Amino acid sequence: MLNRLSHNTVSDTVIADAIAEELDRQKTQIELIASENIVSADVLAAQGSVLTNKYAEGYPGKRYYGGCEFVDKVEQVAIDRLKQLFGAEFANVQPHSGAQANQAVFLALLQPGDRIMGLSLAHGGHLTHGSPVTMSGKWFDVVSYEVDPETHLIDMEKVREKALETKPKLIVAGASAYPRQIDFAGFREIADEVGAYLMVDMAHYAGLIAGGHYPNAVPHAHVTTSTTHKTLRGPRGGVILTNDADLAKKLNSAVFPGNQGGPLMHVIAAKAVAFGEALRPEFSDYAGQVIANAQALAKVLIQGGLGIVSGGTDSHMVLVDLRPKGVTGKIAEIALERAGLTCNKNSIPNDPEKPFVTSGIRLGSSAGTTRGFGVLEFEKIGALILRVIDALATNAEGDSAVEAEVREEVAALCEAFPIYVS
């Protein structure tokens, strides 16, 4: 998948140089950001195609522009493949992002001032699930549920109590920093009990669901949204799925003309390619390996004295509590990047530090698994992370010698598992 990459010459030297530098960074660093992945050369080629020239407001067979015969074909393929992947009756592939997909759902189902309930951002939720700095937090009356302070798991009985008490019109299930399985069936039972819509944002888990290694949200949710990158290994974009024909009409109208104008046909083509890749039998093997690798990484970090939120992972994601080492997420992120390991600082439940400092880091196994890393490589990555963190525990500025040694070992791993070979 990653063994061929055709270089289209960019004559703008400033941009060409930046692209070349970014390509080198991706080749020589180990990507551990849980929301990132490495797409195939085919996905890149589709996204860089002449489809970027075409305006196509509307939907296949019902456009506001002429000349849409071939982009209709592309979008319909994307829709059909997406429905097949998740067992959905209806799908919209036009949202430009996961945030746009969520916003379209709110536009379709809610009125300003309606009450929504989602996982608190401080406990692993996402900005678009009701954070006060976002449209969802400004336009709607938001109540939040949290994870258990001891287990760091979603307590479904507490969610039920909160829903019965507050009677939201829409409940959001999904997260940006929750490594465990989510009880989508349980959420639907609660939504039905209080007369609410259930929207599942499966952005982080979509590829694992497509591969059959994480519970499928689509049979339980009124509406399911997702990004198409992350574990699904497609271009950056969003999608919406439902099994309800009446909701599908409202959702389509909310995407266009309600929330967006012309669709990005080159991105939709890349989505179609990625969905086709995810339908292949080997993608299930990939998804299973992603989880096995994340679990191996978590085990090594626990053995090395770090805390792991919820004690482990059922997904691609490992949320690390750095407090046992007396290190903040901010300095850990910087030091690990110096050593060739890219991750992000991340708040942990009930984090005493500010969001720009944090007590944790979030790690992901998706991109490394795409490179070809297995359990042994992720165990080694865990040991490398510990060396950098232990050096920070001794000296907050880090140990340049340790970081240089780790950087050499990272380079060797990357060389053994190359990406985008010309």
From Swiss-Prot:
Site-annotated residues for Plays an important role in substrate specificity: H229
Binding site for (6S)-5,6,7,8-tetrahydrofolate: L121, G125, H126, L127
GO cellular component terms, A-Z: cytosol
InterPro entries referenced in this protein's UniProt entry, alphabetically: PyrdxlP-dep_Trfase, PyrdxlP-dep_Trfase_major, PyrdxlP-dep_Trfase_small, Ser_HO-MeTrfase, Ser_HO-MeTrfase-like, Ser_HO-MeTrfase_PLP_BS, SHMT-like_dom
Recorded catalytic activity of this chain's protein: (6R)-5,10-methylene-5,6,7,8-tetrahydrofolate + glycine + H2O = (6S)-5,6,7,8-tetrahydrofolate + L-serine
Sorted UniProt keywords: Amino-acid biosynthesis, Cytoplasm, One-carbon metabolism, Pyridoxal phosphate, Transferase
Named cofactor requirement(s): pyridoxal 5'-phosphate
Listed GO MF terms: glycine hydroxymethyltransferase activity; pyridoxal phosphate binding
Residues carrying N6-(pyridoxal phosphate)lysine: K230
Function: Catalyzes the reversible interconversion of serine and glycine with tetrahydrofolate (THF) serving as the one-carbon carrier. This reaction serves as the major source of one-carbon groups required for the biosynthesis of purines, thymidylate, methionine, and other important biomolecules. Also exhibits THF-independent aldolase activity toward beta-hydroxyamino acids, producing glycine and aldehydes, via a retro-aldol mechanism.
Family: Belongs to the SHMT family.
Protein name: Serine hydroxymethyltransferase 2
Source species: Agrobacterium fabrum (strain C58 / ATCC 33970) (Agrobacterium tumefaciens (strain C58))
Taxonomic lineage from the root: Bacteria, Pseudomonadati, Pseudomonadota, Alphaproteobacteria, Hyphomicrobiales
